[in-house]
Amino acid sequence: MKVKEIRELTTAEMLDKEKQLKEELFNLRFQLATGQLENTARIKEVRQSIARIKTVLREQAN
């Protein structure tokens, strides 16, 4: 997700999206461990999206 897209979400939507991405990251890591993951770059994309959401949430808290 782009930061612009994240900023358009409400706080509840951001928290929900973060939860979904964490679940996806868990599944991707599981697939990587079992040798089923084809697109390993997706792990990096998901991690960066989680970080972007956390950054925007932190900015809004201040």
Swiss-Prot record:
InterPro entries named in the record: Ribosomal_protein_uL29, Ribosomal_uL29, Ribosomal_uL29_CS, Ribosomal_uL29_sf
GO CC annotations, alphabetized: cytosolic large ribosomal subunit
GO molecular function: structural constituent of ribosome
CDD domains in the cross-refs: Ribosomal_L29_HIP (cd00427)
A single GO BP: translation
Keyword Ribonucleoprotein: yes
Keywords carried by this UniProt record: Ribonucleoprotein, Ribosomal protein
Domain of life: Bacteria
Family in the record: Belongs to the universal ribosomal protein uL29 family.
Name recorded for this polypeptide: Large ribosomal subunit protein uL29
Organism: Enterococcus faecalis (strain ATCC 700802 / V583)
Gene (name only): rpmC
